[in-house]
Amino acid sequence: MVSRRNFLSGSGAALLGAALVSKAGAASLPEAPTMTTAAMQPPLVPPAGRPYTPVATLNGWSLPWRMKNGWKEFHLIAEPVVRELAPGMSAHLWGYNGQAPGPTIEAVEGDKVRIFVTNRLPEYTTVHWHGMLLPCGMDGVGGLTQPHIPPGKTFVYEFQLEKHGTFMYHPHADEMVQMAMGMMGSFIVHPKDPGVMRVDRDFVFIMSAYDIDPGSFTPRVNEMTDFNIWTWNARVFPGIDALPVRAGDRVRIRVGNLTMTNHPIHLHGYQFEVVGTDGGWIQPSARWPEVTADVAVGQMRAIEFTANRPGDWAFHCHKSHHTMNAMGHQVPNLIGVPQQDLAKRINRLVPDYMAMGSTGGSMGGMEMPLPDNTLPMMAGTGPFGALEMGGMFSVVKVREGLGRNDYRDPGWFRHPQGTVAYEYTGELPG
């Protein structure tokens, strides 16, 4: 509610601005559900009469809502959270409704949305609706378009969704700290016409990066470039879920980038089209085939392909240091350097010391003690041995016979006989 004094003084919390909720209004707030598991949740099925393909958030979930007098109401709680990045490592982050990133918000073009934001952080915050067309006073820039949301207070944002597409939300208050601590989420607006841009499977995730020293839990928020944890929805491989897909499905993957660098996102085994950008959908006549799409800072991209090639297809950022985990950074290159004598001497002081890198960086067969709360540089085991990946890596698993609404991991692909690379033992050609 806007006080008479604030209204008359033009404080920015007036009729078209994000407004403070009164005590009476707070009593009727919609529920603010929370999620603690890091597993990808089944898509939130739309109500009858509003047909669209709901999104599956990679290692995340969609926020439930309620309808009240023609408004679709959501409730976000900005709060400290603990996020498991992968088994063996957790981070103390800030997020929404129990997780970082926060839950995906889904609505339909033309919907009137009312989003309550309760601040349980130790400092003020706001929420900016990245890429959306809305009244200026709802844009969420603290000090410019609205007052900041103080700790313990609830503000409300109200606007009508003018266009469908892929958007994000994040603070515009103490932005360096709050975004570095994980405060972000996806906002998906589905077309009002169910025949527009229809797909069978629709995935979404946000890329974020953190600098967390081994043995610690809280990111270094002043870091600008030298991050050691590169995540998809605040998860790193082998903690990132697979993307299960039915053979023959038309598949969309939406990607948002709120790190401090660009990411060339590469899919094995397929050509895809970039069908959507920050500004909207791309007409079919303006698209071209790609296997790698570069996603710059602050951008959203949507790619589509038809899943007509069954298998387990790698899907990852093509910057190799973005597919490594925390222990793999700032290591000198020792390829070609004999280390046997050095290792013996160091072992007298450090019994668990293991020489690394004299023949390359492979770690598939190595085991060594790690500091508390960190991850090996490369990890994961596949059907043929060590995967040696980390960070921004997952697998698109295309399968015959997968159920229409089945998003469970189908396990490893069973290759038809004679279709796997094998050791050659014959005579080599001259």
Could you describe each region identified by the protein language model?
Residues 2-430:
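Copper-binding active sites and cupredoxin-like electron-transfer domains
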